[in-house]
C-alpha cells in the first residue's frame, strides 16, 4: 500500500454530522496540526507545500510524483494491523505490531484510528452538498493523545492491543484500522499501516424510515416504517420509543417483513397532552441477528396534534 488516508471531518465551514459524532478527537488533531481552514492536507505529518498557486496545505497541490517520492523513502518501521469484532459485533478489537529495522529514538507515539473506508449518503448529511466520504476517522485509540512507545532497538517488535465499544458506525463492512508511528516533537510520520475490512460479516441491516406524524386525536398510535435490507425475513424486533422526552418504553414486535421489503409496526396508543407539536424518538433493536448498520436504526419526528373544532 503506497498511501494510507485518514479524514478528519470538521464543523466548519458547514455542518457535518460526522464531526458531531466525535468532536474531541477531531478538535485535538485540528489543534495538533494548527489547521485554520479546510480542506487541509498533510503528508507524513507535514503540510502540503503550495506549489500549485493555491495555499499551504491545499490537497490540490498533491501530485503522483509527491506520493511516489514519499513512498520511496526508507522507513525504520514495519507496521502490521489487524482487527476483529466480539460475538455481538458491538466492540472492535485491534492488534498492532511495530517492528524496528534499526535503532530509533525520539518522542515516539503510536496513533491508531478506527476509520470507515466509505460512507455514501443518498442526500447530503451536512451543508456542503457532499454525499460521498472516504477514510473517515470515527475514533482514535485509546484517545487522541496516542500511545507513547519509547525507543526501539534494531529488530525489536512491540505489540499493542486496543478496543473500542463502537458507536455511530454506518457500516461494519467498511471499518478499517489505520496505525502510524509519529515523532511527537516534529510531527513527522515515520510509517503507517492499515487493516483490511473484516470478511464474513453477517448481511443484516434493518432501517427505521419514518414514524407517523399527524393526528386529530389526543389518543395517538405511532406507526413506524421499517425496511428489511437483509437476505432473510425479519420476524422480531424490539422497538424502543419515547414521547416528549418521557421515559423510554420497549415494544417487543413479532411478525414478518420479507427480505428487501418495507413494513409498518404499530406501537401502543399513547395520550398526548394538548394540541400542538409533540416529539417522538424511535429506535429499533434486533433481538435475533447482528445489525451491521447501527445508525439507520433511529428515527425522530414531530407529531402534530390538530385542534379540530367539532360542530354543534
List where the protein language model places each region:
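Enriched for extracellular/lumenal, surface-exposed ectodomains of secreted and cell-surface proteins
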Residues: 181-185, 243, 272, 279-295
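Asparagine-centered strand-capping/turn motif at beta-strand->loop junctions
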Residues: 98-100, 226-230
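Short acidic/proline- and small/hydrophobic-mixed sequence motifs that coincide with surface turns
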Residues: 104-107, 231-236
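Terminal edge beta-strands and adjacent linker/stalk segments
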Residues: 193-196, 291-305
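Short, solvent-exposed loop/linker segments at the N-terminal edge
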Residues: 85-90, 212-220, 233
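Short, conserved sequence motifs used for protein processing/export or organelle targeting and
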Residues: 2-204
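Intrinsically disordered, low-complexity Pro/Gly/Ser/Thr-rich segments with frequent PxxP/GP/PP motifs
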Residues: 149-155, 247-274
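Boundary/junction segments of secreted and surface-exposed precursor proteins
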Residues: 199-216, 304-312
